[in-house]
From Swiss-Prot:
Similarity-based family: Belongs to the universal ribosomal protein uL15 family.
Signal peptide: none
The keyword rRNA-binding appears for this protein: yes
Any single Pfam family the record assigns to this protein: Ribosomal_L27A
GO molecular function: rRNA binding; structural constituent of ribosome
InterPro entries in alphabetical order: Ribosomal_uL15 (IPR030878), Ribosomal_uL15/eL18 (IPR021131), Ribosomal_uL15/eL18_sf (IPR036227), Ribosomal_uL15_bac-type (IPR005749), Ribosomal_uL15_CS (IPR001196)
Keyword RNA-binding part of the UniProt annotation: yes
Name of the protein described by the UniProt record: Large ribosomal subunit protein uL15
Any GO CC annotation of this UniProt entry: cytosolic large ribosomal subunit
GO annotation, biological process: translation
Annotated segments matching region Disordered: 1-52
Keywords: Ribonucleoprotein, Ribosomal protein, RNA-binding, rRNA-binding
């Protein structure tokens, strides 16, 4: 098999419409665009959301919500991510070194998701009640 011999399966592609090639083609003269009007012209058409001058739906509805800038620097990790760290001490730096979180993350919270078999010491990370119970049940501990 060579790249120059590859071709799509038979019937997988439709041939393009050949417009403006005479009456007999069925797509001559106006080429399927109808008569006159903005949509018949070259480059004609209206932008997305345009409703002919009527106030468009996206402007009739109220604004709501916002994106917290904090969300770009805070991460949630699962219990099974703790096992990816070398050694038994889990800190912000050790999570970055193990590529569990990206370098720009400033704080982390451990949530109750996944399983943990390894006893680990969690230092300086946020931990939910359920995650704390699971870590302590596995023989680990949490330090502030």
């Amino acid at each position: 098999m060579r790249l120059n011999s590859l071709s799509p399966a038979e019937g997988a592609k439709h041939s393009a419409k050949r417009l403006g090639r005479g009456i007999g083609s069925g797509l001559g003269k106006t080429g399927g665009r109808g008569h006159k009007g903005q949509k018949s012209r070259t480059g004609g058409g209206v932008r997305r959301g345009f409703e002919g001058g009527q106030m468009p739906l996206y402007r009739r509805l109220p604004k709501f919500g916002f994106t917290s800038l904090k969300s770009f620097h805070v991460a949630e990790i699962r219990l099974n991510d703790l096992a990816k760290v070398d050694g038994n001490e889990v800190t912000l730096e050790s999570l970055k070194a193990a590529n569990v979180i990206t370098k720009d993350i400033l704080s982390v919270k451990v949530i109750l998701a996944g399983k943990i078999e390894k006893a680990v010491v969690v230092k300086g990370l946020g931990v939910t009640k359920g995650a704390k119970a699971a870590i302590e049940a596995a023989g680990g501990s949490i330090e502030e």
